[in-house]
């Protein structure tokens, strides 16, 4: 899906980060996505990404979506799972903890805006 997005959105790499609008910052991320640290993938290879609109949060929808995804991942043989959570998203960290995820301790990976969390499948 990255290639399709890249066709629709120009790469604003020619602009300095300070000069980019919020939309251009997102467009830059489409063309230059941050990579998941290898220490995360080697420990917890399965990956899930979930965004819910605020009006849909705290209604059990996220937990139900995770249950369906988790069952499919387990059926395909996933051994452990990871999510990357924005450190500023104070509601997301407790949500993932409620589903059994814990913060991963990663030697050699500097603390950034992403909190890496994992759990056994």
Where are these regions (language model features)?
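Conserved short-loop catalytic and cofactor-binding motifs
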Residues: 36, 53, 84
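C-terminal "cap" of GNAT-fold acetyltransferases
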Residues: 44, 86-93, 97-99, 105-121
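Short, contiguous strand/loop micro-motifs
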Residues: 39, 56, 79-80
């Amino acid at each position: 899906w990255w290639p399709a997005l890249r066709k629709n959105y120009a790469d604003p790499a020619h602009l300095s980060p300070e000069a980019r609008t919020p939309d251009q910052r997102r467009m830059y991320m489409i063309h230059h996505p941050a990579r998941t640290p290898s220490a995360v993938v080697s420990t917890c290879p399965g990956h899930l990404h979930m965004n819910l609109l605020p009006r849909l949060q705290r209604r059990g929808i996220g937990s139900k979506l995770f249950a369906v995804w988790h069952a499919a991942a387990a059926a395909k043989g996933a051994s452990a799972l990871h999510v990357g959570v924005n450190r500023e998203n104070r509601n997301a960290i407790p949500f993932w903890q409620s589903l059994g995820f814990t913060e991963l301790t990663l030697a050699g990976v500097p603390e950034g805006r992403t909190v890496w969390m994992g759990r056994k499948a």
